[in-house]
């Protein structure tokens, strides 16, 4: 066990760093997560065994200065458990951040991979978070809470239609968005469609 302490959790973090800027969410690494959890439990068992042996032999509370080798082993197992737990929390927190970003953007870029990429708990989280967000936005229906906080440099932009959308109503009238057409439109009228992948900004 000593030879591999922290290796699996280190792999989780390295993989997370490599994939954090992808347009899709990579599959949940259930096997690696389970390996890290088992390593934490094994470290706890080793620590408990050391303490039981020392206290049984000495018939008194454990004193690190009296048992330096055992104290060093306990410190090693404790440190590895803390490290593994921090890595697990960082891995899961990063994935939850991506799911929250997905909900707030209202985009569909990740939809194709969500069914196969999420764990059962992540699916539950996504469903409940989406419901909470919908209820929150419903209370402020006159505002677009998912819009960008950075004002556009130009009021009007050129876009190319990637997928047929049909007619959309704007303040200046109806716009027909057919695939492969290019239009000069107001940025605020189409920013949601750009985020959802229907349009591309030129």
Swiss-Prot record:
Chief location of this protein within or outside the cell: cytoplasm
Subcellular location field: Cytoplasm; Nucleus
Keywords: Cytoplasm, DNA replication, Nucleus
Keyword Cytoplasm: yes
InterPro entries: GINS_A, GINS_bundle-like_dom_sf, GINS_Psf1, PSF1_C
Superkingdom of this protein's organism: Eukaryota
Gene3D superfamilies reported for this sequence: 1.20.58.1030
Pfam family, one: PSF1_C
Family the UniProt entry places it in: Belongs to the GINS1/PSF1 family.
Subunit field text: Component of the GINS complex which is a heterotetramer of sld5, psf1, psf2 and psf3.
Family annotation (PANTHER family): DNA REPLICATION COMPLEX GINS PROTEIN PSF1, PARTNER OF SLD5
General function of this protein: The GINS complex plays an essential role in the initiation of DNA replication.
Protein name: DNA replication complex GINS protein psf1
Organism of origin: Schizosaccharomyces pombe (strain 972 / ATCC 24843)
Lineage: Eukaryota, Fungi, Dikarya, Ascomycota, Taphrinomycotina
């Amino acid at each position: 066990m000593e030879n591999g302490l922290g290796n699996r959790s280190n792999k989780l973090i390295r993989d997370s760093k490599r994939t954090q800027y992808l347009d899709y969410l990579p599959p949940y690494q259930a096997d690696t997560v389970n390996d890290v959890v088992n390593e934490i439990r094994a470290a706890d068992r080793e620590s408990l065994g050391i303490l039981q042996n020392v206290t049984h032999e000495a018939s008194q509370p454990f004193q690190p200065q009296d048992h330096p080798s055992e104290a060093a082993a306990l410190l090693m197992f404790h440190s590895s458990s803390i490290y593994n737990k921090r890595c697990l929390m960082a891995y899961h927190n990063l994935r939850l951040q991506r799911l929250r970003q997905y909900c707030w953007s209202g985009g569909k870029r990740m939809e194709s991979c969500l069914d196969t990429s999420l764990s059962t708990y992540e699916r539950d989280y996504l469903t409940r978070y989406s419901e909470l967000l919908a209820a929150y936005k419903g209370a402020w229906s006159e505002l677009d809470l998912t819009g960008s906080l950075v004002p556009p440099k130009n009021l009007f932009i050129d876009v190319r239609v990637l997928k047929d959308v049909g007619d959309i109503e704007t303040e200046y009238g109806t716009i027909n968005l057919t695939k492969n057409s290019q239009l000069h439109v107001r940025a605020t009228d189409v920013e949601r469609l750009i985020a959802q992948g229907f349009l591309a900004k030129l």
